[in-house]
Regions:
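Short, surface-exposed recognition loops and adjoining beta-strand edges that mediate ligand/DNA contacts
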Residues: 39, 66-83, 207-309, 435-444
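Conserved, well-structured interaction surfaces
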Residues: 49, 57-59, 87-163, 178, ...
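Elongated scaffold/linker segments in the mid-to-C-terminal portions of large proteins
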Residues: 103, 256-416, 472-512
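Membrane-proximal, proline-rich intrinsically disordered regions
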Residues: 24-76, 96-102, 254, 479-512
Length: 512
């Protein structure tokens, strides 16, 4: 088994190098230099394994590169305060067209099209391997095609949230010719992504492989929290629908996930497992099944890195040898967000002492947000080197449960919504609430509290900005934010490098 996993890690490294060179260089930039020569590939099971892991690796890189997942999701008008970095401050202030290198890199969507192209190449060429290598079965091919189809749809959803309209490319461009392409309406792209996910779901399993029928040398729990499974696809579907304001479907999909969570061993995560160095964000955690969709940086697989992790921005002494974090949650924000002293995430313990599950160094000017702190392999005692192995967790059961509460409330099923809100509250030490007694049967008050609970529970997980957008579409209680939505200001500007290379790409109107 260990030999198989070693081969898999080597395959991943090879695939990342190969696919990145083939897929990322000037994709969609009308450049004939992009040509993929694959005459030596797609002959064996090892070839398909390398290519599949490569698509996962490129997806992980797209989210982690320049800390995109947190820059776009948590920092923009979020709860984090910036400590002496003007580029990060520009993001926080929504001044995304400032001439900083970080902003230029984040605004370039090329890395996402590397994922899309690699997935398309796989779907077009992997079927030939079934004919050439008898060890690569039709069932194996179905699983693999379903995964890359889902990853491609996920990439499109992720891009739409950042840029709005994006070019919709449904087949590979590995022949060296890239026509100039217009941006496609965001709703058309999301409809395509939903259709692709529904197609993928037909072949995606809850678990991969069995003891008698291994999937690439492993089975069951060994793949948990690592690969796109049936519930991973449903979770992306649920979020696409919520982003569209289609709460009827969002409720249906989120309900399915909750009802079938045991199929993938997903459970509600205790506060200890959520914040432990070997808990949910640790790649090989005992609770890894609760990562409904995540992307790992396993230290033991030589995947841990210095960049591409929240810890790079948030940790400081005594956890790492760094005087100050680059971003932090101020004391004022902590006390205004966590208003209940019984809250296990940030509340009072031992009469006068605050819980340290989310924050350390509370007595200092800049508290350290330590909810996620996977240093090296999670057991590092020598913290001189800032190398991190935390997984990017896109969604977990708490997120989906609160999303269902949001959907139910939007559908005027408020009493049901409260029951799902209470599932999260009681797991974090808070009392149950009543729609009548605590919210006066006021739906808007309940919606506001559901988003406040998401704010507390998902802090530092890349959700705050997108939650603010959805909240405002429902609540409509902030005129400035509503103008931002109507004017397209909720999206990022498109990189000038992209516009220069493709004359048909126009800048988002708000950023012209």
């Amino acid at each position: 088994m260990k030999n198989n996993m070693k081969k898999l890690r080597l395959a991943l490294f090879s695939a990342l190098v190969c696919l990145f060179l083939q897929s990322c260089n000037d994709f969609l930039d009308v450049d004939p230099k992009h040509a993929a020569s694959e005459t030596q590939q797609w002959k064996t099971l090892e070839d398909t394994r390398s290519a599949l892991m490569g698509v996962y690796g490129l997806t992980r890189a797209a989210l982690a590169d320049n800390n995109t997942h947190w820059i776009c999701g948590d920092l923009r008008k979020g709860d984090f305060t910036v400590y002496k970095r003007s580029d990060l401050q520009a993001v926080s202030d929504n001044e995304l067209n400032k001439p900083y290198d970080l902003l230029k890199k984040v605004s370039n969507w090329r890395r996402f099209y590397a994922v899309i192209n690699a997935a398309s190449v796989f779907m077009e060429k992997a079927p030939r391997t079934v004919e050439l290598d008898r060890s690569y079965s039709e069932q194996n091919l179905k699983y693999d095609i379903a995964q890359v189809r889902a990853l491609r749809a996920f990439a499109y959803f992720y891009m739409v949230r950042i840029w709005g309209d994006v070019p919709l490319v449904t087949y590979s461009y590995d022949n060296g010719t890239f026509p100039s392409m217009l941006r496609t309406d965001a709703q058309t792209v999301l409809s395509y992504a939903k259709a692709e996910l529904l197609t993928a779901i037909e072949d995606l399993p809850y678990q991969y492989g069995t003891q008698t029928n291994l999937y690439y040398g492993s089975y069951g729990a060994q793949w948990q929290g690592k690969l796109f499974n049936k519930l991973s696809a449903y979770s992306v579907l649920a979020h696409i629908c919520a982003w569209q304001g289609n709460y009827a479907e969002a409720e249906t999909y989120s309900a399915f996930i909750i009802d079938h969570a045991s199929e993938i061993n997903a459970k509600y995560t205790s506060i200890a497992d959520l914040t432990s160095e070997t808990g949910l964000f640790y790649s090989n955690a005992s609770v890894k099944g609760s990562r409904i969709l995540g992307f790992n940086f396993a230290h033991n697989d030589n995947e841990a890195t210095q960049s591409g992790h929240l810890e790079q921005l948030t940790l400081a002494y005594p956890l790492v040898q760094k005087s100050y974090p680059e971003i932090y949650i101020s004391k004022d924000s902590l006390f205004s967000i966590f208003t209940n002293f019984d809250d296990l995430r940030f509340g009072i313990i031992d009469t006068i002492k605050y819980s340290s599950y989310y924050v350390q160094n509370l007595n200092e000017e800049t508290p350290v947000f330590s909810k996620i702190k996977i240093i090296q392999d999670g057991s590092a005692k020598d913290n001189d080197f800032g190398v991190f192995g935390s997984s990017i967790v896109f969604t977990r059961l708490e997120d989906i449960t609160l999303l269902r509460a949001e959907a139910l409330c939007a559908l005027n099923r408020s009493t049901e919504a409260v029951s799902y809100l209470n599932m999260i509250r009681t797991n974090r030490g808070l009392r149950e609430v009543s729609f009548k007694k605590d919210f006066g049967n006021n739906r808007e008050s309940l919606i506001a509290e559901i988003f406040e609970e998401r704010r507390r529970e998902l802090m530092g997980e890349g959700w705050r900005w997108y939650d603010l957008v959805r909240r405002q579409k429902l609540m409509k209680d902030n005129e400035a934010f509503l103008r931002l939505i109507s004017s397209g200001g909720i999206y990022w500007p498109v990189s000038e490098d992209i516009i220069t290379a493709n004359s048909q790409i126009e800048q988002n109107e708000f950023w012209k």
